[in-house]
Amino acid sequence: MTHPPPFIAVIPARLASTRLPNKPLADLGGKPMVVRVAERAREAGAQQVLVASDAQSVLDAARDHGFEAVLTRADHPSGTDRLAEVAAAFGWRDDTVVVNVQGDEPLIDPVLVRDVASHLAAHPACAIATAAHPIHDAADVFNPNVVKVALDAQSVALYFSRAPIPWSRDAYQPHWPDVAAMPAPAFPVYRHIGLYAYRARFLRTYPSLAQAPIEQAEQLEQLRALWHGERIAVLITESAPEAGIDTPADLARVQALFQPGSK
């Protein structure tokens, strides 16, 4: 087995979730959610796992289970900004690979985390790596909550959008705007997976980058990097990852998986 290059996993976690308050501390089989996520990051082979939060209760929960935790400001507009604060505080080398593991994804596959980190290490011209998988359902292509990514010949991101990209003129135009009548895509359409690996150099510069008009329009923060000329390498996987936890119903579904005897 080939060992992955060294990488650091940072788990940004905040309590102020509008749909699910205190989400990082939700119990999953006797452990807080943020700890379950940290365990997945450790299984991925991260040389360092950090929980980053503005809430002392989250830091205490992580430390009680043997994980390193760091206090961050409460006014960060995104998880990337929180990572940027951590990168600046620790003074990591420019080429250090830092993976943002979302704090509400306790079922994330450690192999995917490791592979995205390795993908960035293998693409020195890129500042960021992420992942995507093929879409086979036309409903997903036209769903604005499903973010699509268009790629170049080297699987580097050209653009991310909530709109259906690429638009197939011949396949879609005859049916527009009847989305229900749209055929399944006969060409590669990729759904973006919100897992990112960054070079520490980029994280330190990120807070100084002005927001991009396309970022504000689409409400996709990764477009800021493209707008400012950074390259994003995209790892193609065959299937979608397990969904994260956003609502009480999501939490109940995942809690059931952590019950004794569940598979």
UniProtKB/Swiss-Prot annotation:
Full protein name: 3-deoxy-manno-octulosonate cytidylyltransferase
Top EC class of this enzyme: transferase
Listed under GO biological process in this entry are: CMP-keto-3-deoxy-D-manno-octulosonic acid biosynthetic process; lipopolysaccharide biosynthetic process
| Pathway participation | Nucleotide-sugar biosynthesis; CMP-3-deoxy-D-manno-octulosonate biosynthesis; CMP-3-deoxy-D-manno-octulosonate from 3-deoxy-D-manno-octulosonate and CTP: step 1/1; Bacterial outer membrane biogenesis; lipopolysaccharide biosynthesis
EC no. given is: 2.7.7.38
Q: Which domain of life is it from?
A: Bacteria
Q: Briefly state the protein's biological role.
A: Activates KDO (a required 8-carbon sugar) for incorporation into bacterial lipopolysaccharide in Gram-negative bacteria.
Pfam families noted in UniProt: CTP_transf_3 (PF02348)
Is Transmembrane among this UniProt entry's keywords? Answer: no
The record lists the catalysed reaction(s) as: 3-deoxy-alpha-D-manno-oct-2-ulosonate + CTP = CMP-3-deoxy-beta-D-manno-octulosonate + diphosphate
Can you say where in the cell this protein is located?
Answer: Cytoplasm
